[in-house]
């Protein structure tokens, strides 16, 4: 078990500990539960779906990287597939505050990058900030997405974001988590192809500036992130953050990164290179390259 989970795990009910122990035994537990695992945990612990999600929130929050605020937020995105995806907030010392990943963004990006097609609910241990409410409004689940908070009745995103501005106001039909493939040809080595594949998945209906990042760890594991734009622009999640989020949720540290590649168009309206390189260098990675989509 990764050390970050030990305190939260010790506070779980005994029957839930017994069921979770073999799942968490892997140091690189992927911070997600399959639909089958969720069903097993519900039956073993005698909890319904909502109660189980609340019980597991401390494990999600344990994934937080909060060197600046020391305020850990955890979230669990519940996919329409039945799979659950952990998320937690991330802060990057030496970079800028704008590079921060919020817990809800973390869980949602996690689900999206693992191929989830839509979300039924998000469970989070603190009320979503306005930034996250706007981010969630880009999803194909729309304002019907259920939000679950401890000690409160469940509500929909519509309740948390009244008179919402979103993609429909800009006549955007393809939403975040809808299947997309922009068709860029895969070239180069394995890491380069992974970055291009991530760029092909980008949600970028506002700038039409696709981008993807691939990070290679010292053990050969590769994590990718795809660009996810938002109708309100500022809640947009850059591709590097998506990749760093997956890497961290899987129990890796920034020091494990040995190479990074950004895939983007050289003549795009928005360019990720400078911000991507600056953030990676702040985290200690200097082996950074760029491949141009064409």
UniProtKB/Swiss-Prot annotation:
Name of the top EC class for this enzyme: hydrolase
Residue ranges occupied by any CMP/dCMP-type deaminase domain in the UniProt entry: 48-168, 186-294
The reaction(s) this protein catalyses: cytidine + H2O + H(+) = uridine + NH4(+); 2'-deoxycytidine + H2O + H(+) = 2'-deoxyuridine + NH4(+)
Keyword Transport appears in the UniProt entry: no
Keyword presence, Hydrolase: yes
Pfam families listed in its UniProt record: dCMP_cyt_deam_1, dCMP_cyt_deam_2
A GO biological-process term: cytidine deamination
Cofactor binding note of this UniProt entry: Binds 1 zinc ion.
Domain of life: Bacteria
Residue positions binding Zn(2+): 102, 129, 132
Coiled coil ranges: none
Gene Ontology molecular function terms on file: cytidine deaminase activity; identical protein binding; zinc ion binding
Cofactor(s) this protein cannot do without: Zn(2+)
EC number per UniProt: 3.5.4.5
UniProt-annotated catalytic positions: 104
Binding site for substrate: 89-91
GO cellular component, one term: cytosol
Annotated keywords: Hydrolase, Metal-binding, Zinc
Function of the molecule: This enzyme scavenges exogenous and endogenous cytidine and 2'-deoxycytidine for UMP synthesis.
Similarity field: Belongs to the cytidine and deoxycytidylate deaminase family.
Subunit structure: Homodimer.
Protein name: Cytidine deaminase
Gene behind the chain: cdd
